[in-house]
UniProtKB/Swiss-Prot annotation:
Keyword Signal appears in the UniProt entry: yes
Name the record gives this protein: U9-agatoxin-Ao1a
Superkingdom to which the source organism belongs: Eukaryota
GO molecular function: toxin activity
Keywords associated with the record: Disulfide bond, Knottin, Secreted, Signal, Toxin
Family classification: Belongs to the neurotoxin 37 family.
Location of the protein in the cell: Secreted
Signal peptide: 1-17
Domains: entry comment: The presence of a 'disulfide through disulfide knot' structurally defines this protein as a knottin.
Tissues where the protein occurs: Expressed by the venom gland.
Disulfide links within the chain: 40-54, 47-60, 51-87, 53-72, 62-70
One Pfam family it belongs to: Toxin_34
Length: 110
């Protein structure tokens, strides 16, 4: 019976320690400077979501369900459309200027 109480006590202490650790982690993340939260990630670097990747056509790719890690890669115009709906930061969507389907090449004569 004492062994059961000791195990229950250790479980309670472990649970409380995890709660405190999670609270400290969330308060640390809230204290991160706003510039660091808004900074975008260049292609080839590790990411956690599409809105972190710089450029309107770049997105966060996680091959093999993230087993190899996730990184920003170049996408297409549909990535731009999706990011316009999901992402709130302007520095992610500002390069290159123009719409999602814009092209610098103009067709002449047709």
């Amino acid at each position: 019976m004492k062994l059961l109480l000791a195990i229950a006590g250790l479980f309670l202490v472990q649970t409380l320690a995890e709660d405190v650790r999670a609270h400290e982690e969330s308060s640390f993340l809230a204290a991160v400077a706003p510039e660091e939260q808004r900074a975008c990630i260049k292609e080839g670097e590790k990411c956690a979501g599409d809105c972190q990747c710089c450029g309107k056509w770049s997105y966060c790719s996680c091959p093999l369900f993230g087993a190899l890690g996730c990184s920003c890669i170049i996408g297409d115009a549909m990535v731009c459309v999706r990011k316009k709906k999901e992402c709130r930061t302007s520095d992610v969507m500002n390069t290159p200027p123009g719409g999602c389907f814009s092209s610098s090449k103009r067709r002449h004569g047709r």
